[in-house]
Amino acid sequence: MMYIKNTIQDFVIKFKTNDLNMGEIDFTAEENESSLPVNLNGEIRFFYSHLILNDHPTFYGTFFIQIVESQDLNEILSGWRVQNDTAWHDEYIIFAERNGDVLFCDTRNITSPVYGSIQKRNFIISGSLADFLDVFCSAIEIEQSKYDGDGTDDDFNFREDFLGDIDFMLKGKLKDVEAKGFKQFFFG
């Protein structure tokens, strides 16, 4: 559990370092389980029981996502739980949203593997929530420190060198199929 704890703490730090981010994310060492409306286990349970989330926390920039607050977990899931939908399981927990697409964990596995879903088509992004948080924070670090918070050119297309740097980082941290999923979710 050390790895997930460290990646969550880094996630909070990355959130706080960008003034353009909205809402509030804080880490708490004390387990805060009173407010979990859905059944969680593994890394996603650790995530929600050690984060204080307020005012629709949203990361700004290329890797824009809005984190789902624990009290909203049921509500966001209700739109995805459709009868006779074999592609969607009750064990899927949506933890972030981006323009109507979502990131979710499969709680059937203790590591909480992360998937992206674009127009209800699901694909793997990482073998664990900790791995996702690690690459997400690394991607933000690249965008903020090397590209001054903007990986696009004058025509708002992603810069080739920016995409290359993200690609290189992903190759070092994820399986190829996962890296492809990460890029599909954030770059289309």
Predicted segments — roles?
Residues 137-168:
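Mixed-charge (acidic/basic) macromolecular-recognition segments
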Residues 99-102, 109-110, 120-122:
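Short, solvent-exposed loop/turn segments at secondary-structure junctions
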Residues 54, 101, 111, 139-142:
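Short loop/turn segments at secondary-structure transitions that flank enzyme active sites
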